[in-house]
C-alpha cells in the first residue's frame, strides 16, 4: 500500500512538473505556435472577415457532410475556394434545414470576400 502511494505521488510530481513548465521551456515547445496552427486550418483563400465562430460553422457543414458520405474528396471539395463551390451547396442542402440556407450563404460571402 505504501509503495502504491509512493508511485502515485511520483507520477503526480512528473505530470505536474511537465504541466507547469518554466516560460523558457514553454517558449521552445511546439505549443507556442498553437494560434498559428489553428488559424492555418482554414483556407487561405478566405480573404474576408476572419471570424473563428463563422468559419467553424461553415467547417462543421463540411465535417458533417464528410461524416455522412465518408469520402475524403467531399471534405476537401466542400472547403475549396472558401466554401464558394457546388460541393458546399450540396452539403448545405443535405445537412442544414432549408430555412437556414440563406444565412449560411451570406456567411460564405462574408468570409470569402
From Swiss-Prot:
Name the family. Answer: Belongs to the arthropod CHH/MIH/GIH/VIH hormone family.
GO molecular function annotations of the record: neuropeptide hormone activity
* Function recorded in the entry: Hormone found in the sinus gland of isopods and decapods which controls the blood sugar level. Has a secretagogue action over the amylase released from the midgut gland. May act as a stress hormone and may be involved in the control of molting and reproduction.
Biological processes, Gene Ontology terms? circadian rhythm; glucose metabolic process; neuropeptide signaling pathway
The yes or no answer to whether the keyword Signal is present is yes
Q: List the disulfide bonds.
A: 46-82, 62-78, 65-91
Modification sites for Valine amide: 111
Instruction: Cite the entry's keywords alphabetically.
Output: Amidation, Carbohydrate metabolism, Cleavage on pair of basic residues, Disulfide bond, Glucose metabolism, Hormone, Neuropeptide, Secreted, Signal
Q: Output a single Gene Ontology CC term carried by this record.
A: extracellular region
Q: Where is the signal peptide?
A: 1-26
Which protein is depicted?
A: Crustacean hyperglycemic hormones B
Q: Where in the cell is it found?
A: Secreted
The tissues in which it is expressed are: Expressed at a constant level in the eyestalks of juveniles and mature females. A low level expression is seen in the central nervous system.
Which PROSITE patterns does its entry note?
CHH_MIH_GIH
Amino acid at each position: 500500500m505504501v509503495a502504491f502511494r509512493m508511485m502515485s505521488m511520483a507520477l503526480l510530481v512528473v505530470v505536474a512538473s511537465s504541466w507547469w513548465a518554466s516560460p523558457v521551456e514553454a517558449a521552445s515547445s511546439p505549443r507556442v505556435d498553437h494560434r498559428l496552427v489553428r488559424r492555418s486550418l482554414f483556407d487561405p483563400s478566405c480573404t474576408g472577415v476572419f471570424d473563428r465562430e463563422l468559419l467553424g460553422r461553415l467547417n462543421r457543414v463540411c465535417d458533417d457532410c464528410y461524416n455522412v458520405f465518408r469520402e475524403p474528396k467531399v471534405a476537401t471539395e466542400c472547403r475549396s475556394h472558401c466554401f464558394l463551390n457546388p460541393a458546399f451547396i450540396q452539403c448545405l442542402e443535405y445537412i442544414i434545414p432549408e430555412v437556414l440556407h440563406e444565412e449560411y450563404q451570406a456567411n460564405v460571402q462574408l468570409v470569402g470576400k
